[in-house]
């Protein structure tokens, strides 16, 4: 259910883009993200930081897109969010000395520090590459290509990278945890 709530605003954005335009889709994205946030709060009585940051970014950049009637803002949102995620991962590892990935998954998994560091760094690089790819697609290709890339391309890349991360984790798990 949680994954569906995270993905729902993206589906709404895509549908409204196909039915109307980028501006109606941006407004629908704001509303859908807010509703998903409210529903999550009432169902789980908890909002994850990443979810809250994403909502705030959608609210700010979606509103700027509507107020200035300029799709550059909603296009930049993707890169800024990915860059913030990458920075959070890098700061957690390099400054705070405990990878964010380990903080998120360390209660369920026991892995060597080297594995946590590699996984954390891999996700940071992944987010940076996705942010750069978004810049390229958003500013050098037609808007319709960017929307498809945002909805399907980045989602597929994230799913594949998550699966690869799962394989990497499994290969380094202690035998007793694999059961």
Swiss-Prot record:
Spans traversing the lipid bilayer: 22-42, 50-70, 76-96, 121-141, 149-169
Keywords per UniProt: Cell inner membrane, Cell membrane, Membrane, Transmembrane, Transmembrane helix
Alphabetized InterPro entries for the sequence: YciB
Keyword Membrane: yes
Sequence similarity: Belongs to the YciB family.
Source domain of life: Bacteria
Membrane topology: Multi-pass membrane protein
Function: Plays a role in cell envelope biogenesis, maintenance of cell envelope integrity and membrane homeostasis.
Pfam families linked: IspA
Gene this protein is translated from: yciB
PANTHER family, sorted: INNER MEMBRANE-SPANNING PROTEIN YCIB (PTHR36917:SF1), INTRACELLULAR SEPTATION PROTEIN A-RELATED (PTHR36917)
Gene Ontology annotations for the cellular component aspect, listed alphabetically: plasma membrane
Places the protein is found: Cell inner membrane
Protein name (record): Inner membrane-spanning protein YciB
């Amino acid at each position: 259910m949680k994954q569906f709530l995270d993905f729902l605003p993206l589906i709404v954005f895509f549908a409204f883009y196909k039915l109307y335009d980028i501006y109606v889709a941006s407004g629908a994205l704001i509303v859908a993200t807010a509703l998903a946030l409210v529903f999550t709060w009432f169902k789980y009585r908890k909002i994850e930081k990443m979810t809250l940051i994403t909502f705030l970014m959608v609210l700010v950049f979606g509103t700027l897109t509507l107020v200035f009637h300029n799709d550059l803002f909603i296009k930049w949102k993707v890169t800024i969010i990915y860059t913030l995620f990458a920075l959070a991962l890098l700061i957690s590892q390099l400054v705070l000395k405990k990878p964010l990935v380990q903080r998120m998954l360390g209660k369920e998994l026991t892995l060597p520090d080297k594995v946590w560091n590699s996984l954390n760094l891999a996700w940071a690089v992944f987010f940076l590459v996705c942010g750069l790819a978004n810049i390229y697609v958003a500013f050098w290709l037609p808007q319709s290509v960017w929307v498809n890339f945002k909805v399907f391309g980045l989602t597929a890349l994230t799913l594949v990278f998550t699966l690869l991360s799962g394989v990497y984790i499994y290969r380094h798990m202690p035998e007793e945890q694999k059961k």
